[in-house]
């Protein structure tokens, strides 16, 4: 009988399988990042993978809407797979308005986007992130950036850089240049400032109606500068915003330092729900974009009708794993129990049970392999100890224990072996 064709045996395009050594690496990173979030007082949350399409599409922007996995269920309801966790969490909070504020939540979960798969980018992927809901203070912005920095450091991204901006600064700048009507096209162009040639970035603006001289001026202004200089830059554009930024930078300096933080006017983020401070994180030898976030003070009002300040960030887990070189974690089996004789099976089960109670992993040979094949098998899967139990050992009440790392073998009474394990 013929099996499935090759394309059906592979994952669906944009998806991936996680083999044990890959999944243990994922779990290791999950544990590290969860500890960081919980050390800041954040609590883990989960939401359904499936949401009403209207909830997802309400403030995402057309580009993201086009990437939603959309379908109708058997009742005819328009549904979609979540593309991030910020929108579902905003919905949850809108349905639970009596929750004490500020809310500090974090997540480590799967999200879905139907975009073009690339190296290190999938249509089904994991995100780790946090949401801080209920505070408009610049201390809240500083806390979230601080938590992002600590998360990157904990993951091993010691050379990370976080670039920050504020959409309100860009909006005020455009107002002063008489370009407020072109905000959307300017945002689209700025987002490509370091991803595309100058002519392409300027061309996006001019084709959208921005005068060529203004487009060139905006391109020149959309550069990087130290955060301390950014305070003066923002103050010249708007005094009130300058005051906010001065406090924000002061709190950042106290919390995380400014060495790895930089102001970049081209950082605007692709989601339409951002309203204030925005930022992106880069890590690894090639400075991969591994995450980002910002403030979304209007999003919850769309769902609850109540104005609620909020901000957060999300890290693309697979991208971060690539940036820090975390691709595989081996988890050896502790004990493999090989029995020569059927009469030893009950004793082998007893030994395995006692080892498991002590927190070890233990496997009893199923009877399909001879000792030579079993030995080759345990080496291939990664095993610390091979325990041998035959008729002679059973009569003497002992086991042979072979340490596969030290290449040593000892014989021990069964009870002594279990006590000393």
From Swiss-Prot:
It is an enzyme of class 6 (ligase). SUPFAM superfamilies: Class II aaRS ABD-related (SSF52954), Class II aaRS and biotin synthetases (SSF55681). The keyword Translocase does not apply. It comes from Pyrobaculum calidifontis (strain DSM 21063 / JCM 11548 / VA1). This is Histidine--tRNA ligase. Its EC number is 6.1.1.21. GO terms for biological process: histidyl-tRNA aminoacylation; L-histidine biosynthetic process. Keywords: Aminoacyl-tRNA synthetase, ATP-binding, Cytoplasm, Ligase, Nucleotide-binding, Protein biosynthesis. It catalyses: tRNA(His) + L-histidine + ATP = L-histidyl-tRNA(His) + AMP + diphosphate + H(+). Its main location: cytoplasm. One of its GO terms (cellular component) is cytoplasm. Belongs to the class-II aminoacyl-tRNA synthetase family. Pfam families: HGTP_anticodon (PF03129), tRNA-synt_His (PF13393). One of its GO terms (molecular function) is ATP binding. Gene3D superfamilies: Anticodon-binding domain (3.40.50.800), Bira Bifunctional Protein, Domain 2 (3.30.930.10). It is found in: Cytoplasm.
């Amino acid at each position: 009988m013929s099996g499935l064709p090759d394309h059906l045996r592979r994952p669906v395009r944009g998806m991936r399988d996680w083999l044990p050594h890959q999944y243990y690496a994922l779990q290791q990173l999950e544990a590290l990042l969860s500890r960081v979030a919980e050390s800041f007082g954040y609590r883990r949350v989960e939401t359904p993978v499936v949401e009403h399409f209207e909830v997802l599409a309400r403030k995402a922007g057309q580009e993201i809407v086009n990437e939603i996995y959309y379908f109708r269920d058997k009742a005819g309801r328009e549904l979609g797979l979540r593309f991030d966790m910020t929108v579902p969490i905003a919905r949850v909070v809108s349905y639970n308005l009596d929750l004490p504020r500020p809310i500090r939540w974090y997540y480590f979960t799967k999200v879905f986007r139907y975009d073009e798969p690339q190296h290190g980018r999938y249509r089904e992927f994991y995100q780790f992130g946090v949401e801080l809901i209920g505070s408009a203070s610049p201390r809240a912005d500083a806390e979230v950036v601080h938590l992002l920095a600590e998360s990157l450091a904990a993951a091993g991204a010691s050379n990370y850089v976080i670039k920050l901006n504020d959409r309100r600064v860009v909006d005020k700048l455009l107002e002063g240049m008489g370009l407020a009507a072109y905000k959307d096209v300017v945002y689209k162009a700025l987002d490509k400032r370091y991803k595309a040639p100058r002519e392409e970035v300027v061309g996006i603006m001019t084709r959208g109606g921005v005068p060529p001289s203004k487009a060139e001026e905006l391109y020149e202004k959309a550069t990087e500068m130290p955060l301390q200089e950014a305070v003066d830059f923002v103050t010249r554009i708007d005094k009130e915003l300058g005051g906010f930024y001065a406090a924000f930078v002061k709190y950042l300096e106290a919390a995380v330092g400014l060495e790895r933080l930089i102001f970049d006017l081209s950082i605007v983020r692709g989601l339409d729900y951002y309203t204030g401070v925005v930022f992106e994180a880069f890590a690894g030898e090639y400075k991969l974009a591994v995450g980002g976030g910002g403030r979304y003070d209007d999003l919850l009002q769309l769902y609850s009708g109540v104005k609620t300040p909020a901000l957060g960030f999300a890290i693309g887990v697979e991208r971060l794993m690539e940036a820090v070189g975390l691709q595989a974690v081996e988890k050896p089996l502790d004990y493999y129990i090989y029995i020569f004789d059927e009469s030893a099976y009950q004793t082998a089960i007893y030994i395995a049970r006692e080892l498991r109670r002590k927190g070890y992993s233990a496997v009893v040979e199923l009877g399909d392999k001879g000792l030579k094949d079993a030995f080759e098998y345990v080496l291939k899967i990664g095993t610390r100890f091979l325990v041998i139990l035959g008729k002679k050992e059973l009569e003497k009440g002992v086991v042979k224990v072979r340490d596969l790392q030290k290449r040593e073998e000892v014989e021990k009474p069964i009870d002594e072996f279990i006590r000393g394990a």
